[in-house]
Amino acid sequence: MFRSIAALFILSSIVFSKETINKHQLQAVTNKSKETSKAKTEVLTGLDILLEQKPYFIQGRSIALVTNKTGIDKAGIPNYQRFMEMDDVDLKMIFTPEHGLFGKAADGEKVAYDSIGIKLPTVVSLYGNIRKPTPDMLAGVNTIVYDIQDIGTRFYTYISTLGLVMEAAGELNISVLVLDRPNPIRGDIIEGPILNMEFRSFVGYYPIPIRYGKTIGELADLMITNNWISPAPVLDVISMEGWHEKLWFDETDLVWVNPSPNIPDLETAIIYPGMCLIEGTNISEGRGTPHPFKWIGAPWIDGWDLSQALNKFDLPGVEFVPKSFIPDKIPGKAENPKFENQKCSGLEIWVTDRDSFKSVDTGILTLFSLYAMYPDKIELREKHLNMLWGNNILFKELVKGSTGPYFLQHYN
């Protein structure tokens, strides 16, 4: 493998640099070009099917809608607008997950609505002091409709909101209707451990793997069939047409809408399941930069040394490139980024082949390499790391001095 020597990249002159684009990065660009040039598969979401074929699921009903800006139909019209245009549907309430209705709240920021400037029913955030709808909020509601684009990762909190909404519905004998949408990082790939319920939290609410390989509708069904919710609500799922589990999101004809401020594109969603583990340390996961989760670093890291150490693992589908960056406060995206206004050195992650790339393996080897190279600088945030990983084994093996390959062989 021609990994340790940077290839020459000719623009107007030959440039020699530790960050010179090499042949693996050129392959990534080539692969991305092929991905975007493929013919798109026509997909109708659960919302499209509801509106065009099955409106009877909500006709004559008083509904509460759980959604955000990703809940649009094929024409790009928000679901709440479509429901408000239906004479025989009473939209009583809109509930929003983390980041709010318009996806403008930063990660972890509590959201409250007083006046949002447009004519809507009552809008209530389920990412403030209240994360589960109360009986008063659901008074007069007989169906809760859930329509949010997820990204197929356990600690992405929208699925925790789904579970809590279904719990409230079951307790109050309210039916739930889930409008299915694609798993953007495919529905046939599973990565990472199943959550140990001793470590249950809002970033891990059900015993599923980190990359769980289900659509949101399939996951809702799983919650019912596995008796994870009791009493269980009556659940209906309106499935998609045209989608299948081997499709990446950009292989569909659907429009990508950023599901949250720090997931700006599909490649970030692909990298996220493993690189979000960096949140469990004092190392920047790239918030406050244009490329969260693709860029990681700290002022005391040597990006060249770290990239070379990781490239030696010869992981499929990924190349590690030295990167320097300065995290900055970005309103609505990164309010308090790690190492704000400090120059960081670290990595840029290039996915050269997303079909073979394993995000969780990448995150694990990155963590073990960082811990081995900077034992006096890196800080592990034990509680948060355990919640993300789903048990305490990763933390224990890191502090014990195990190697990344050993961990992958025995525990992943």
Regions found by a protein language model. Give the residues of each.
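Bacterial Sec-dependent N-terminal signal peptides
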Residues: 1-37
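Short internal beta-strands
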Residues: 90-98, 179
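Glycine-rich, charge-decorated loop segments at or immediately adjacent to ligand/cofactor-binding or catalytic sites
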Residues: 103-107, 177-199
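Glycine-rich oxoanion-binding loops at beta->alpha junctions
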Residues: 111-141, 153
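Glycine/threonine-rich flexible loop motifs
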Residues: 150-162
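Conserved anion/nucleotide-ligand pocket segment
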Residues: 200-272
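Glycine-rich, aromatic-lined ligand/substrate-binding cores of catalytic
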Residues: 243-328
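Conserved functional hotspot residues or short segments at active or partner-binding sites
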Residues: 297-410
